[in-house]
């Protein structure tokens, strides 16, 4: 049996779930997901969210296990009865086209969790000719030494490019600091739903994307068909302890990357 540890926010949970599905395909053994990380209160809160989506996440049951970290080789695992994977696994090379298509279907919020306000926004966005999701990540990034907070200049460049190539663009702003966004942006729609998973579903409904250095908007853009995606060319403030490899993985899709310098 394969056991994948779930931890972090929604974007990280999606990466860990997808990696588990990849491991299941490669090994031919079932995957289970360890959700114990969410049994502890954290600041800021990072609730378990995969139960809101269309995928089926199996519970775990094991007595002995070997922890496998991201730096370890997967080649020597065949003889282990129970393998426990601990990491974020943020690498799109894990997903072949068949798995990616399945993830596109599974990474939708179950309709039983849709609210009236969400449904109204969803229907409006789907009718928009060129709905563009713009994601601003601030929040915990403001107080973390390694996280890079994107400047308003980045978004100005991205918006100028989108407005030059898309007819009648309609901008929908998603953020964990919506008040800051209201001070910066004009002639846009501000999405203020409290549930992150519903914001993610609305973001997926958009046709094009201006993403932040965040797994949340990365996934919304990565799952889209034929979208124009603008992303920052730098993911982290520092490039230490393997972060340059992580950054290269996150910036591997064929998108337009804006130089932050």
Q: Which role fits each region the language model picked out?
A:
Residues 113-115, 239-261:
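Leloir-type glycosyltransferase catalytic cores
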Residues 5-13, 144-151, 202, 213:
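Aromatic-acidic/polar surface patches that form glycan- and anion
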Residues 36-166, 251-254:
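Secretory-pathway luminal glycosyltransferase catalytic domains
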Residues 1-6, 30-34, 129-142, 172-173, ...:
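Short hydrophobic beta-strand segments
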Residues 1-40:
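N-terminal pre-catalytic "stem/leader" segment of glycosyltransferase-like enzymes
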């Amino acid at each position: 049996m394969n056991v994948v540890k779930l931890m972090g926010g929604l974007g990280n949970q999606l990466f860990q779930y997808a990696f588990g599905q990849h491991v299941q395909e490669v090994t031919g053994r079932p995957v289970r997901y360890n959700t114990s990380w969410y049994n502890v209160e954290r600041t800021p809160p990072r609730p378990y969210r995969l139960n809101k989506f269309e995928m089926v996440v199996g519970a775990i049951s094991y007595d002995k296990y070997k922890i496998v970290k991201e730096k370890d080789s997967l080649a020597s695992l065949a003889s282990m009865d129970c393998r426990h994977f601990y990491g974020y696994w943020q690498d799109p090379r894990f997903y072949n086209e068949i798995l990616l298509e399945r993830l596109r279907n599974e990474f939708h919020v179950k309709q039983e969790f849709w609210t009236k306000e969400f449904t109204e926004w969803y229907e409006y966005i789907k009718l928009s000719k060129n709905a563009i999701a713009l994601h601003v990540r601030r929040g915990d990034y403001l107080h973390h030494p390694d996280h890079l907070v994107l400047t308003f200049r980045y978004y100005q460049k991205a918006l100028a490019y989108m407005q030059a190539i898309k007819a009648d663009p309609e901008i929908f702003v998603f953020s964990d600091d919506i008040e800051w966004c209201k001070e910066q942006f004009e002639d846009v729609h501000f999405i203020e739903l409290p549930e992150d998973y519903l914001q993610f579903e609305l973001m997926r409904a958009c046709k094009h994307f201006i993403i932040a250095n965040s797994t949340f908007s990365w996934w919304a853009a990565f799952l889209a068909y034929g979208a124009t995606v603008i992303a920052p060319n730098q993911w982290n403030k520092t490039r230490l302890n393997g972060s340059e490899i992580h950054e290269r993985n996150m910036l591997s899709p064929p998108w337009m990357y804006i130089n932050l310098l």
